[in-house]
């Protein structure tokens, strides 16, 4: 995890983010300091890709909720902290109201983290607690290494799901379900012949 020493506000960070290495794609703002995470491997992208397809199907059926990808969520001010979970699912406000933003202070109903690198794994417990304290109802942690998903609903015991188990979003996304193994399935075009 690399960092720079200049303290920024969330808005300054959003303005400068695309000037950072990799367009700031793997950068977060922690107490005003830019922190660059390790670029994830293909298994991270594959899990997000597969979840994106499932959420796309859900969005076509669901009249209110929608997903945002790599949207910065402002979790603290003075000094500012902006975290970028892989996926955020919103049920409140205008449909797709957060979609075109780089950062927002609106908290989603569901946050999806992907534990694909050591630096992403290191602070997961603290991040989950923070999400719940800020009103996020459900946190999923996708672990591409063990091919498991940890589903942590606020105020409830964490649930660990493996291939063959069904991932559900309960009241957060009514009717959503996905067999866990589908998250880790390689696309047919990816497979070597």
Residue ranges and their predicted role:
Residues 1-193:
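Gly/Pro/Ser/Thr-rich low-complexity, intrinsically disordered segments predominantly at protein N-termini
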């Amino acid at each position: 995890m690399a960092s720079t020493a200049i303290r920024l506000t969330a808005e300054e960070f959003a303005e400068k983010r695309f000037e950072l290495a990799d367009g700031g794609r793997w950068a977060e703002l922690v107490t005003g300091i830019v922190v660059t995470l390790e670029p994830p491997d293909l298994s991270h992208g594959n899990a997000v890709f597969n979840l994106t397809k499932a959420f796309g199907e859900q969005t076509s059926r669901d009249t209110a909720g929608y997903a945002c990808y790599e949207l910065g969520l402002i979790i603290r001010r003075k000094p500012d902290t902006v975290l970028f979970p892989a996926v955020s699912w919103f049920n409140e406000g205008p449909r797709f109201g957060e979609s075109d933003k780089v950062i927002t202070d609106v908290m989603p109903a569901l946050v999806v983290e992907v534990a694909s690198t050591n630096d992403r794994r290191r602070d997961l417990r603290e991040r989950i607690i923070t999400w719940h304290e800020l009103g996020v109802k459900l946190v999923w942690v996708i672990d591409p290494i063990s091919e498991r998903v940890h589903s942590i609903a606020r105020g409830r015991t964490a649930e660990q799901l493996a291939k063959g188990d069904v991932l559900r979003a309960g009241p957060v996304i009514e009717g959503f379900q996905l067999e866990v193994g589908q998250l880790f399935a390689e696309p047919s075009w990816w497979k070597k012949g």
